[in-house]
Amino acid sequence: MVTDVQRKLVQSTFAAIVPIADDAAMLFYQRLFEIAPELRPMFRGDMTEQRKMLMQMLTAAVKGLDRLEQLVPVVEDLGRRHAGYGVEDRHYDTVGEALLWTLEMGLGAAFTADVKDAWATVYGVLATTMKNAARDVLVPVLR
């Protein structure tokens, strides 16, 4: 569960990332493909557009932490769509690792242990929500 302190830490530190959003997204994908080159073929389209979509999704998620009842259905839909792209449960851990690394690079000294824990918690909740929604799509296919 995400505490109010964690929610506020994520929102305040994300505000510091917004001015460098394109660079942060570029760093994220560079790191993702560095630690998991097998994921590169999943991204066939324009990476400029992909970076923009990543930051739009992160912005919506961070803002949505104030309105979880509205955020959860959006995140579930995202999880179902990602299942169709071939995303597997194990990929979420890799994405989380790349995200935390990117935040550390972007925030520098502001990326404290508490900030890291807050982001890891929020990402964990979002990733679990996406994985559960993806299973709802995949399970009927496997039966």
Model-predicted segments: where are they?
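Globin-like tetrapyrrole-binding proteins
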Residues: 1-143
